[in-house]
Structures are given as C-alpha cells and as structure tokens.
Amino acid sequence: MRAHCLLHVPFEGLGSIEPWLKNNGYDISYTRFYESHQLPDVNSVDLLIIMGGPMSVNDEAEYPWLIQEKLFVRKCIDAGKPVLGICLGAQMIASAMGQSVYPGSYKEIGWLPVSSVSDDQRLGAAFPVYSFPDTFTAFHWHGETFDLPAKAIRLASTQACLNQAFQLGERVIGLQFHLETTMGSAAAIVSACRDELVPDEFVQTEKQILAAPEECYLSAKSIMYEILAFLTA
C-alpha cells in the first residue's frame, strides 16, 4: 500500500502520522512542493495526506503549483481515495471542491479546546461518520478558514472558528487543527513562524505552547490514529 504525502514547507511534516503509516504497512512517498512539483499517478495512491503550510490556497500567483495540487486533490477525491487534509490541507480540499478560503475572524495559535458538533446531515448519512470526543485539546496555527464543501458534514468547531473539521463522503476528512503534533514539530513551527505570535484572544505565547504537558500530545495522537484507522478501514 502507498501513502502519498503533500508537503509545503520543511517544518510541517507528518509528525506522529509517520509511525502509524509504517506500522500499518504503508510505503510512504512525498511531493515536497518546496523542492519539486512532481505528482504521482492517482491510481498508484492508496491514501493521500495533505499537510499544512504558511501560504494560502489563494496564493496561486506566488505559488503556481497550487493549481496543479488542487487538481490532483480533486482527482483523488473523485477516484474515491481516502484523503486526509490538515490545516492548509483541509483548506486545500475545500478549495479543490469549489469553496472559498478566506481570513477568519481570529487567528488561532496554540493548544486550544475543540468541541464535537452534531451536524444534522450526520443523521441521514448513508455511510459511517467519524465522531470526535465531546471536547478535546488540539494544536492550532491558522489565520484563514473556509466554507464547507457541498454535502460535507461538520464534525467539530471552536469558539473562534466554526468549521474546524469535516467529513466529505465516506473517505475524506479535513482538519483545521493539528493532531499529528509532536514536541519536535511544535518547536519547529514556533521557530519558523515566531513572528506570527502576536498577542490576541486565541493566540498563546511561545512559552505556553512549548510548556504543553505530555498529555496534550498523547491525546492528540490517539485521536489522530483513530481517524487514520477510520479512513482506511
């Protein structure tokens, strides 16, 4: 089995997802857009994972490869491949499905609470729908949000952002937050994006972010692994 991963910057990698893939028999391949824009044949991909990055999906003039990436993501979705989008990756799914991505009312940066929601569409779904815990803590680093793709089911929200997670059909999940975060990956994004830590209602300090207890990482990893198992069942 092959998991193909779309990476946008060197400091936002797979985190805790990588050992799960290896332990579950996946060969891992990458498109690192900061090095090369080469994408595989859709038919060769068994699982697509789209990671985060500081750019916007709207920055096509500065990053022309975004056009190619959106087309590839749409092809994978249309082909029925399991697709997981994280942060920019969730926004990429929304954009690939024809929806708008735009600045949110607030930036969210740090370890912040998330609430599961009961979307009415969940009740009438003809397929299993993932359920988050009622409340949990996840790592956030975003300033933009998006409109849900048509027929997508909202799964989670925060006080600052309505669309934190969604499921599209049986095999596509988008997460605005990061569940793959490790101590190393948290330190890496803080180091690379420290200038974004401008005090605001939903922005933690560097000290607060890096002082998060181990339980935050373990809980996030547990939910991340549940989602991966759900998508690939």
Predicted regions and their residues:
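Tryptophan-centric aromatic hotspots in well-structured domains and transmembrane helices
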Residues: 20, 111-113, 125, 141, ...
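Cysteine-nucleophile active-site neighborhood
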Residues: 50-120
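Hydrophobic/aromatic beta-strand patches that form the interior of the parallel beta-sheet core
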Residues: 4, 29-31, 49, 84, ...
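Short glycine-/acidic-enriched loop or helix-start segments at secondary-structure transitions
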Residues: 15-16, 59-61, 94-96, 150, ...
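Pocket-forming structural segment of enzyme catalytic cores
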Residues: 97-184
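Glycine-rich, phosphate-binding/catalytic loops in enzymes
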Residues: 20-23, 64-68, 101-102, 157, ...
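C-terminal and late-domain segments of enzyme folds
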Residues: 155-156, 161-167, 171-233
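N-terminal beta1-alpha1 cap of cysteine-dependent amidohydrolase-like domains
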Residues: 1-81, 198-233
